[in-house]
A protein has these predicted regions:
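Beta-hairpin "wing" of winged helix-turn-helix
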Residues: 27-32, 60-69, 75
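Positions that flank functional sites
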Residues: 38, 73-74
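N-terminal helix-turn-helix
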Residues: 33-65
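Residues at secondary-structure transition points
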Residues: 6-10, 14, 49, 61, ...
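Extreme N-terminal segment that seeds HTH/winged-HTH DNA-binding domains in transcriptional regulators
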Residues: 1-33, 39
C-alpha cells in the first residue's frame, strides 16, 4: 500500500480507497481479516487514529465489520 503524504486526498481516504479496491477486486476475500490497526499504522508510519478512521469508513460502507478483540473482517 502506498501513501502520498503531499496529496490533496487525506491519508485515511487513501487507505480506505486502496483497501476498498482490494476487497472489490477479490484480492482481500470475504472472511479475511484486515491488518491490525496498530500494525498498519506502524508499517505506513501514520497515526493509529488515521488508520482507525479509514477502517471505520469501510465499516460504514458495509464492506467490513469490527469483531471485538479480533479486528476487522471482510463481509
Amino acid at each position: 500500500m502506498k501513501i502520498l503524504q503531499n496529496s490533496d486526498i487525506p491519508i485515511y481516504k487513501q487507505i480506505s480507497s486502496q483497501l476498498r479496491e482490494q476487497i472489490l477486486n477479490g484480492i482481500i476475500n470475504e472472511g479475511d481479516y484486515l491488518p491490525s490497526i496498530r500494525g498498519l499504522a506502524r508499517d505506513l508510519k501514520i497515526s493509529v487514529i488515521t488508520t482507525m478512521k479509514a477502517y471505520e469508513e469501510l465499516v460504514d460502507e458495509g464492506l467490513v465489520s469490527a469483531v471485538h478483540g479480533k479486528g476487522y473482517i471482510v463481509n
